[in-house]
Amino acid sequence: MKMKNKEYENTQKGIAKQMLTCILCFVVYLIMLLGVLNRSPGFTDESDNFIGGMVVASGGRMYRDFVSQHMPVMYHICAVLKMLGADSVYEFRLYFYVVLAVMWSFVAMHYKKQFGQITAVGTGVFYITNLFTFYTCCILAEQVQSICFVVLLMEFLLFAERKKLDWNNCFMISGAVFLSFGAAFVSAFPIFAIAVAFLVVEIQECIRKKYGFLQSIREIWQTFWRAIVTILAPFALLIFVYAAEGTLSVFIYSAYTVNREIYPNYIAGYGSRIVMSFVEPVINYGMAIADGCRKLVTDFGITKEYLAIVRNVICYAVNVIFWVYYAKKKNIVQAVAIVYFTMMCGTRGFTHEFHSMPYVAVTMFMAAYLIGQFTEYFKTCNVREEQISEVQKKKQGICYAGAVVIGITICIYCVQYVGACRSILLTGQNFCSAQKNDVNNIAYWVHTLTDVDEKVLLTTIEPQILVEADRIPYRTGISAPWMYEAFAEEEMSNLEENAPRVAIYTPEYNLWGYDLTEYAPDFAAYMSENYTPLDEEKFPELYIRNDYLGVAKAIYNE
């Protein structure tokens, strides 16, 4: 009986310790994230997520009531934040940071036993220190992708070690695949790369066991069928939901057809050729390394720009060290697979702007992993000085040098963090939560001239005004030339039937060199005929439907 009581006490202590560690991780991550809260103002892609979330939270249907070429996960996350009370950029970010802190804490606790505390906890810490680059602090799909790609790499390393996938592994892989692809379509490329890496490991195992072709196929199926089922399940559920809502066809058209067939015409063909999408990141990575090394010499100076260059080069160095270490310690073929996955994570960039954050996250995991391995190595070298070989001394020297570089980098970020916190405390900046109460702000009049659930016609790619006014858009298929090309007939038909009373419209609106009057002449003519500016001098972009103009002017002039 005493033995059982002791076991129970030990179990309870273990659970308490786990909970305390998890809470500490959450607090540390959240405090670090708060340091970048006001690092950049509202951003187009971020505001788009807000608006989509507001539409969903108000009962609207994605891709039917809110036209978008993006995948749905970020909109649904923002919808939850809106329902929790988020009413400004400040509040949306604050709530989202809580979500990020929970996700990073979960990853740290889940993989702490397999990878060690330094690697599991350190990955999130290192990643967050990279969010001081402009726009990387925003609520973007890249934030979700970053966590998911780290999970996929961790699961691959575990599979390469164990050669098996249990249900726990499958659920983690399924969640990472669904959230990353559901947040951004381009996640398909790194997902494909890591899937190939998993397959390579299993094929190597079949070759090692000298299986025949048919036996190898059976073995591969036996290994991966659970993962296939768990990965397909959430996508099947999503398809079922959209089919039930009657939005499945428009979802496929918006998220796939527009991105593959129409949008590439406006971005130099990017994404139109599938084969090149798997090759270009490799080429771009090589060019990024060459450019970084060149600028490291030619652009020397004590500036933020040069610090960014140094940071980029350190990331490339971490990649190479990890690849070489893994190839030497584990398997060179698997190392090559990891190389390709790393490059595919940088499909949108490698140079510390917000599109490159998934690549940065994977690199930060590699840095934390190497530090964890070096720490274990130091423990094995805890012997008398004369027993340490020259090779071991050299390895220790390299490890110490790496620790110094990492320490300096962390100190630099700590200085930035303190400065950011000071800015928040001094300015009390809350990012437009009070704009709808300021009569000199257009958001006030959009809010005043519309009812609570009334929609506003938005014709630009900057939805910030609607976020400030706490109003949702009347579709958004006019704000970009590729979206108008995709939805012109539907947009004009809807306007003829049910035109909003208030519109945000700029006749001179130009996006990437495309004038609205040129890519949407029918719409421009319709606006000229049916809408009039409320106050052309003070708010030239605020238009009122002609039959509501008299009432609006009376309210405005009170």
Language model features: what each stretch is:
Residues 105, 287-334, 338-342:
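Hydrophobic, aromatic-rich transmembrane alpha-helices
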Residues 113-118, 150-172, 180, 204-211, ...:
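Membrane-interface transmembrane helices that cradle and orient dolichyl/undecaprenyl
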Residues 169-187, 191-198, 233, 339-347:
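Membrane-interface alpha helices of multi-pass inner-membrane proteins
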Residues 137-145:
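Short acidic/glycine- and proline-prone juxtamembrane loop motifs at membrane-interface regions
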Residues 8, 190-235, 239-243, 365, ...:
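Perimembrane helix-loop-helix junctions
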